[in-house]
Amino acid sequence: MEYEAVIGLEVHAELKTASKAFCSCSTAFGGEPNTHVCPVCLGLPGVLPVINRQVVEFGLKTALALNCRVAPFCKFDRKNYYYPDLPKNYQISQYDLPLATGGYLKINVDGQERVIGITRVHMEEDAGKLVHVDGPGGGYSLVDYNRTGVPLLEIVSEPDLRSPAEARAYMEKLRAILQYLDVSDCKMEEGSLRCDANVSVRPRGSQTFGTKTEVKNMNSFRALQRALEYEIERQIAILEGGGRVEQATMAWDESRGVTTVMRTKEQAHDYRYFPEPDLVPLEIDAAWIERVRRELPELPDARCRRLMDTFGLPAYDAGVITSSRDLADYFDRVVARYPDAKVVSNWIMGDFLRLLNARNLEPGQAPVPPEELADLLELQKEGTISGKIAKQVLEEMFASGKGARQIVQERGLVQISDTAALGKIVDEVLAANPNVVEDYRNGKEKALGFLVGQVMKATGGKANPGLVNKLLKERL
């Protein structure tokens, strides 16, 4: 029997506000443990929460960018459960009246566009963080409450995803949108973008959902894809063996490449939701919604279309460049100085991204300013350096932080375009390779490429390749 996966994602994005959701404590990452806390976020008696208006603003931007219907009336609720990192023993969240519902997001996998439904977008606060310590006589855990009360948006998809690759594409697209909106830094390694996956399998063609498990602890796009691949295979193996999938919360173990049972999956009633008595409901008028809509920035899909329409870039190239706001901004700044967009795209898609990935850097961390890359391309265009040398110069720019012209001058990399000087070297190469010359004259076109290579080798790659070709053909 052939099975298909049914996947829905619950994504938590920490918002880039200066203060927490319901108090004035800092949201800065990396502070000393338990220094960004106050009686409100610790849940001490005698204090009341106050909603941070920017949290609502960021929620509206996200909801509109995801094509959701914003509720004119919503409220907060208490989600009750007991865990050491939750000092109040409840989390302020939204239950039956969330901020927004009924949106969608478009993804593209293997050239196929799919529309993934967004069930809801709601606001809530984050919990603290447990730090597990191994010590003599047994381990113990410490609690850091700095993250407690940091504002989150939870974005819940419909169970419309049908493969781990689609789930990864969805997460990557969602991260891009959040970064374009500038509402979250989306640093998965710091926990500011987290994802839980609800996954089940069913016979292909069936409309009935199978028993789902929830998979947690996936802190990268690669981990998300690997965890889902394993969990889907695990569930199929159980069903094919005549067993039954048990509803549970699973943890992804990255080092072992397996999912393991954390606990039996809770139902909504286990959390005993009830309206938050210390916060009044929110009424969001149409004027506020329309102002936020007008102020939305150019989003990834629109920017991708602009690069295709304005510069004639292929859909794939435009999609890669606009998948990151920082990378798209970098491209625009290079093109502003060097207007051949296709050349810029080729360099960014090739050597630039290769060097970034080799150093595990994001586009916003590139050590080469866009103006310097434009300068490098100008040096190549004007014939000062060859394409091969330009690639070497870019590598040194990444390594040293120096500008292109400085490197070219210091290392004496200026392209040789002197006809007399090159002619002498060409003559020497022809004299040293009579058999190759004979091959070319007998119709073997590849022989010319060998001779060009020998001239380039003799000049340390500094010869003007166009002039070398011209001189060789004249002599042959």
UniProtKB/Swiss-Prot annotation:
Segments crossing the lipid bilayer: none
Reactions catalysed, as given in the entry: L-glutamyl-tRNA(Gln) + L-glutamine + ATP + H2O = L-glutaminyl-tRNA(Gln) + L-glutamate + ADP + phosphate + H(+); L-aspartyl-tRNA(Asn) + L-glutamine + ATP + H2O = L-asparaginyl-tRNA(Asn) + L-glutamate + ADP + phosphate + 2 H(+)
Ranges in coiled-coil conformation: none
Any single Pfam family the record assigns to this protein: GatB_N
Gene Ontology molecular function, alphabetical: asparaginyl-tRNA synthase (glutamine-hydrolyzing) activity; ATP binding; glutaminyl-tRNA synthase (glutamine-hydrolyzing) activity
NCBIfam families named in the record: gatB, PRK05477.1-2, PRK05477.1-4, PRK05477.1-5
Oligomer status and interactors: Heterotrimer of A, B and C subunits.
Database matches in PANTHER family: GLUTAMYL-TRNA GLN AMIDOTRANSFERASE SUBUNIT B MITOCHONDRIAL AND PROKARYOTIC PET112-RELATED, GLUTAMYL-TRNA(GLN) AMIDOTRANSFERASE SUBUNIT B, MITOCHONDRIAL
Function: Allows the formation of correctly charged Asn-tRNA(Asn) or Gln-tRNA(Gln) through the transamidation of misacylated Asp-tRNA(Asn) or Glu-tRNA(Gln) in organisms which lack either or both of asparaginyl-tRNA or glutaminyl-tRNA synthetases. The reaction takes place in the presence of glutamine and ATP through an activated phospho-Asp-tRNA(Asn) or phospho-Glu-tRNA(Gln).
Protein name: Aspartyl/glutamyl-tRNA(Asn/Gln) amidotransferase subunit B
Native organism: Moorella thermoacetica (strain ATCC 39073 / JCM 9320)
Gene from which the chain derives: gatB
